């Protein structure tokens, strides 16, 4: 997980939160690629078709790793888990939960060139960026 891009991390997390069992092959396709291969959505969709019969043990280990990564990220970057898009409120606010891909767009200021840079960032660097941006907006 240390080499994940922000895009891979956010895409896998959004799919996991939406319906981790239905999206298991796609989540595996996003996170498990040949070394050095960049993430491409079309390739991931094709790979997901081939992973449909993947053993449940692999899925469970993959999910345990993703959950462990989130626990570490939450310890290091807690502000990322209180959404800046909902003013950092927790609980039932009547608003739809912020998606990780929305945070990625927010971190890139919703500008195409900046968003592409953010997508290619390492996931840990992305979390540090989001955490610092939340801090900056909180002190304005």
Task: Spell out what each predicted region is.
Residues 1-140:
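An amphipathic, hydrophobic-aromatic interaction surface with interspersed Lys/Arg
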């Amino acid at each position: 997980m240390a080499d994940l891009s922000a895009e891979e991390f956010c895409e896998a997390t959004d799919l996991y939160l939406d319906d981790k069992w239905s999206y298991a092959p796609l989540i595996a396709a996003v996170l498990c690629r040949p070394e050095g291969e960049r993430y491409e959505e079309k390739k991931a969709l094709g790979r997901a078709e081939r992973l449909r019969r993947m053993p449940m043990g692999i899925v469970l280990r993959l999910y345990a790793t993703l959950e462990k990564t989130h626990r570490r990220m939450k310890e290091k970057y807690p502000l990322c888990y209180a959404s800046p898009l909902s003013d950092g409120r927790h609980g039932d606010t009547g608003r739809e939960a912020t998606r990780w891909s929305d945070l990625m767009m927010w971190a890139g200021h919703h500008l195409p060139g900046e968003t592409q840079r953010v997508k290619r960032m390492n996931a840990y660097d992305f979390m540090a960026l989001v955490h610092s941006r939340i801090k900056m907006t909180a002190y304005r």
